[in-house]
Amino acid sequence: MSEIYRMRFTESDKEKKTKMWQVLVRHYLQQFVKKDFVVLDLGAGHCEFINDIICGKKYAVDVNPGVKDYAGAGVEALISESTEISVIPDNSIDLVFSSNFFEHLPDRETALKTLQEVRRILKFQGSIVLISPNIACVRWEFWNFFDHTLPFSHQGFCEALAVSGFEIKKVVPRFLPYTTKTRLPQSSRLLRFYLKFPLCWRLFGKQMLIVAEKR
């Protein structure tokens, strides 16, 4: 799959994505993270989120060893399956973040096992913040990417979280556009504008945002 990513994103694309992630973190996602939090980025990929978030301790978890090349200063990169992050103790993480990860899992059983593992490592009332394509919005476009295997709607994912021992705190069915290759937003300035006006989300959003808390 690493060859797919090399074909999909040029160096210019990666630079643009990094800048847009900086805006997304600083102008929206930071609100969920206190400065003393222990944060784990699940399926961290190029580490755009975890490198920029301000918190006390940072973990980047990915099955791809290449994650170590992208983890910035102060980020501990862990090579691990999402269903068994054995190096992380029980009840030790304040917040787990995951973006564009669950749709790559092979089946729903693996998704549920992953959520159970997330619950294990979270502190009591710790949170998971999830961004993922919403099949209710993106529909057939979901399959435009060869490595997408597991579609979820916001309703379906909330149900999976509930049965895994989480309480839903926030659901935005339409949050971000489906891909950075879409027409909007196409720059850091446009993204800042977009994040300030939820009406834009309803027009262009095809990815969901869900925040849930460990019960």
Where are each of the predicted segments found?
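Conserved acidic functional residues
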Residues: 90, 103, 145
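Active-site micro-motifs of SAM-dependent methyltransferase domains
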Residues: 84, 103, 137
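Short acidic capping loops at alpha-helix termini that bridge into adjacent secondary structure
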Residues: 91-92, 125
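Short glycine-centered segments of the SAM/dcSAM-binding site in methyltransferase folds
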Residues: 38, 126-127
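S-adenosyl-L-methionine-dependent methyltransferase catalytic module, highlighting the catalytic core
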Residues: 15, 97, 106-121, 127-215
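Conserved N-terminal segment of class I S-adenosyl-L-methionine
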Residues: 1-89, 95-99, 115
